[in-house]
Amino acid sequence: MANVKVKIGIIGGTGVDNPNIMTDRQEKFVDTPFGKPSEPLITGNIQGVECVLIARHGRKHTVMPTDINYRANVWALKEEGCTHIVVTTACGSLTEAYRPGEIVFPDQIIDRTTKRPSTFYDGQTNSPVGVCHIPMHDPYCSVTKQILANEAQKLGIPHHASGVNVVIEGPRFSTRAESRMFRGLGGEIISMTAMPEVALANEAGLCYAAIAMVTDYDCWRDDHAPVTVESVIATFKVNVANAIKILIAAIPEIAAKDWTEIINERKSQVKPPILDSTWVMFIREYRKIGSDDASKLM
């Protein structure tokens, strides 16, 4: 069996959604069964590896976490032929050990979101058929995550190779009571966009990993000033340069690996398998006209 050709989707947060990190850039307007992605795709190359970039919040950071079209973003990357999704995200720290300015490569999630469609299989006319009970015991791809951590180590960037990511609805920050509750649940960092993004990537059979940039201590500490947007942005700007360094160094390492077995295993966990837009259109018309006339669509 031929090796799987690696193509990497990048979902960038503020500062890491700059298309200048790519060569041979082209803007591509796409639509999906779930609507349009946050922004047009940017296709191109990083270190000779084909990549596709999406600005998660829009290039002007105008889309709040709840309103991001996560399904369209992930679906668009799947249809572009991506095998991996590597994302960047800001996060707060829920432990003294993870300090502002450091990088975390999370391996687990506690989902506290409440308002977001979290599956492609929602029973609507534009969705794949059936119900997908995707395994989520290890939501992040451990192999991709380790490559990112290895490159951070080589670059001498302070980082943590694992972390439990608590994902809140936002856009507000936590109360002190909530922050302490999240610590009690085992959370180590807190962010707003990993869910349903990682679940959808798993439904799409893609390897998903994150570069989480610690911008602040969340408000669980009595002796620390409350979180403010200004303090978060100031630290985040310092983190961005390190995140880009890791991304650029890791992408050729990801591409050099034979992912055939891992990708096939991920695809085998998706039951029923995810379908492309052509098949979704077929299903939509099939439902309209009924099985007796389905041959007309062949």
UniProtKB/Swiss-Prot annotation:
Annotated residues for binding of phosphate: T14, R56, H57, T89, A90, T193
GO molecular function, one term: S-methyl-5-thioadenosine phosphorylase activity
Binding-site residues for substrate, renumbered to this chain: M192, D216, Y217, D218
Cell compartment(s), UniProt: Cytoplasm; Nucleus
Assigned EC number: 2.4.2.28
Enzyme class, broadest EC rank: transferase
UniProt keyword list: Cytoplasm, Glycosyltransferase, Nucleus, Purine salvage, Transferase
InterPro entries: MTAP, Nucleoside_phosphorylase_d, Nucleoside_phosphorylase_sf, Purine_phosphorylase-2_CS
Database matches in Pfam families: PNP_UDP_1
This protein's GO CC annotations: cytosol; nucleus
Pathway in which this enzyme or protein is active: Amino-acid biosynthesis; L-methionine biosynthesis via salvage pathway; S-methyl-5-thio-alpha-D-ribose 1-phosphate from S-methyl-5'-thioadenosine (phosphorylase route): step 1/1
Catalysis: reaction(s): S-methyl-5'-thioadenosine + phosphate = 5-(methylsulfanyl)-alpha-D-ribose 1-phosphate + adenine
GO biological process: L-methionine salvage from methylthioadenosine; purine ribonucleoside salvage
Site (Important for substrate specificity): S174, V229
Top-level taxon of the source organism: Eukaryota
SUPFAM superfamilies associated with the record: Purine and uridine phosphorylases
UniProt similarity note: Belongs to the PNP/MTAP phosphorylase family. MTAP subfamily.
Its biological purpose: Catalyzes the reversible phosphorylation of S-methyl-5'-thioadenosine (MTA) to adenine and 5-methylthioribose-1-phosphate. Involved in the breakdown of MTA, a major by-product of polyamine biosynthesis. Responsible for the first step in the methionine salvage pathway after MTA has been generated from S-adenosylmethionine. Has broad substrate specificity with 6-aminopurine nucleosides as preferred substrates.
Complex and partners: Homotrimer.
Name the UniProt record assigns to this protein: S-methyl-5'-thioadenosine phosphorylase
Originating species: Nematostella vectensis (Starlet sea anemone)
